Amino acid sequence: KYDFPWLDKAVALAAKYDLKVIMCTSTATPPVWLSRKYPEILIKNENGTVLDHGARQHASFASPVYRELAYKMIEKLAQHYGNDSRIIGWQLDNEPAVQFDYNPKAELAFRDFLREKYHHDIKALNDAWGTAFWSEVYSSFDEITLPKTAQMFMNHHQILDYRRFAASQTNDFLNEQCLLIKKYAKNQWVTTNYIPNYEEGHIGGSPALDFQSYTRYMVYGDNEGIGRRGYRVGNPLRIAFANDFFRPIQGTYGVMELQPGQVNWGSINPQPLPGAVRLWMWSVFAGGGDFICTYRYRQPLYGTEQYHYGIVGTDGTTVTPGGREYEPVSYTHLR
């Protein structure tokens, strides 16, 4: 059953105050009934630990069951909101990363990936992986397992192909979501909010997206060798590098999450120095960024991120120090 009245109420409230809405697909936080009814969707780490409900991002992009149910939900969302003028765009998932899943379904998908890449020719794979060394020759794709990176001197060609496979799973999942939405949303853009983990190789790999966005947290308990103010300002290169990385992909890009104050997840969670939030915002625009969103508007009253600051405090009305820095930059940028 798909129930929209609660979400309709939130969209209507935003519209009442002339706010445009970016709708997010909730694939990073599957409900508990899904994990219990279909435990095969859960990610299995290399050490055998199976992720479970109670956090987030525990469902595998390589799971056919999870994809099928996720796509059904997304299509219903798109049918409901695709022609809604209050919705300006969509964010897919949340901070989608490359998953290194050791679930049996992921292993089967990895073999299919290799069959396609090497045109069902096991000799071609053996030649590419150099398996003649150390008697690693395979006679069938069915003999290949996911690489055990904890095992010393694992074949690095195999690891590289596995990382490419894992990146392709993330890219395909996002691309399919985007195509589903665009069937119904002709005047709404679609993006996602990547964490700039450049080495994972998946950023920009979903061509259906209209543009790319990134998430950036600057102050989280590491001064990164930039002086005594580093704990409260952050390293400006973190924004500058992200700007230079994202800008060439499609030209248009932005920041979907920029902290307005302390976070909850760092080793130390200091308040940004006065003026730091404003500095970060202008750094994004100076580097060519087209928009900035914040995470979050109101500090939550409960949950894992209870101590994550917002533009306003827990009472929902008192503007925080960082929140006050959003206002002048927003007005100046609009002019």
Please provide the spans of the model-predicted regions.
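Polysaccharide-binding and catalytic clefts of secreted carbohydrate-active enzymes
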Residues: S35-P39, I43-F241
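A general structural detector for well-ordered alpha-helical segments in enzyme core domains, enriched
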Residues: D3-A10, M73, L77, Q177, ...
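A structural alpha-helix within SAM-dependent methyltransferase catalytic domains
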Residues: D8-A15, A78, G82, R247, ...
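Short, solvent-exposed turn/loop segments enriched in Gly/Ser/Thr/Pro and often Arg
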Residues: K1, C24-W33, I88-A97, Y194-Y198, ...
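Residue-level signal for threonine
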Residues: D3, P31, N103-E107, T320-G323
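Aromatic-lined substrate-binding rim segments of carbohydrate-active enzymes
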Residues: K1-N45, Q177-Y184
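Loop/turn elements at helix/coil->beta-strand transitions in domains of secreted/extracellular proteins
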Residues: A15-K20, N83-I88, K186-W189, Q250-T252, ...
